[in-house]
Amino acid sequence: MPYEDLVRKILTEGTLKSDRTGTGTISLFGQQMRFDLSKYFPLLTTKTVFFKGLAYELLWFLKGSSNINWLLEHNVHIWDEWADENGDLGPVYGVQWRSWPAPTPEDPNRTIDQISNVLDLIKHHPDSRRMIVSAWNPAEVEKMALPPCHALFQFYVADDKLSCQLYQRSCDMFLGVPFNIASYSLLTMMMAQQAGLKPGEFVWTGGDCHVYDNHVDQFLEQLGRKPYPYPTIEIRKADSLFDYQYEDFKVVGYQHHPTIKAPVAV
């Protein structure tokens, strides 16, 4: 189902619900979209998507960082509202991806690098059904400035292609989901490149898929626009998954409609 069609479905079939931010939403549960990464890079075209922001955010996740100062150095401010006065967010995505706490009596500081482990499985055990990364750590959720919205993802190898499915528990359809689609598609392409595979599918599965009440007018404007064909992306191969830089990515043929501004529900 195309993104725009899912939004229309939410607006016409969704349930009015309250939410943590007090804004109010129109919500549907358990929806799915699929994107063929062998043919295109799914960067939304009915409005401008901030590719620089999502690319730097992904690289920041892969660094395993909990502090936004590196993002600020690159003029990316998407996490500013949640950070404390020192720029810290607590043990959010990158920390869980790269250093999930797993203490033992022998090593109380032991951690698990989920990303490295999964990449190793993709390379050496491609039929494994355990190629999973989780950002949802119940023991640390209360320490996070914002609990993970995109909570868990799984990789799958078939016919020399790498696919990925994301489960997103909370889906801000206007501001968050376009970012998440492109970010995990980019990650899948990077992982495939490092493993010597071709990109397959990105499958997005959403739990609470919602349109905030104060985003409805923006969506009505957006849904009146005709989508352009998706662009493609060129990725210069880095020495390792953790050595990519923003300059290694080149989006090709990105034809898009203008930006539509909307408030963030914090």
Swiss-Prot record:
PROSITE patterns: THYMIDYLATE_SYNTHASE. GO terms for cellular component: cytosol. DUMP binds at R20, R129, R130, R169, S170, C171, D172, N180, H210, V211, Y212. Its EC number is 2.1.1.45. The keyword Transmembrane does not apply. GO terms for molecular function: thymidylate synthase activity. It catalyses: dUMP + (6R)-5,10-methylene-5,6,7,8-tetrahydrofolate = 7,8-dihydrofolate + dTMP. The active site is at C149 (nucleophile). One of its GO terms (biological process) is dTMP biosynthetic process. Keywords: Cytoplasm, Methyltransferase, Nucleotide biosynthesis, Transferase. The keyword ATP-binding does not apply. It is found in: Cytoplasm. InterPro entries: Thymidate_synth/dCMP_Mease, Thymidate_synth/dCMP_Mease_dom, Thymidate_synth/dCMP_Mease_sf, Thymidylate_synthase, Thymidylate_synthase_AS. Pathway: Pyrimidine metabolism; dTTP biosynthesis. It is an enzyme of class 2 (transferase). (6R)-5,10-methylene-5,6,7,8-tetrahydrofolate binds at D172, A265. Catalyzes the reductive methylation of 2'-deoxyuridine-5'-monophosphate (dUMP) to 2'-deoxythymidine-5'-monophosphate (dTMP) while utilizing 5,10-methylenetetrahydrofolate (mTHF) as the methyl donor and reductant in the reaction, yielding dihydrofolate (DHF) as a by-product. This enzymatic reaction provides an intracellular de novo source of dTMP, an essential precursor for DNA biosynthesis. Homodimer. Belongs to the thymidylate synthase family. Bacterial-type ThyA subfamily. This is Thymidylate synthase. It comes from Bifidobacterium longum (strain NCC 2705). The gene is thyA.
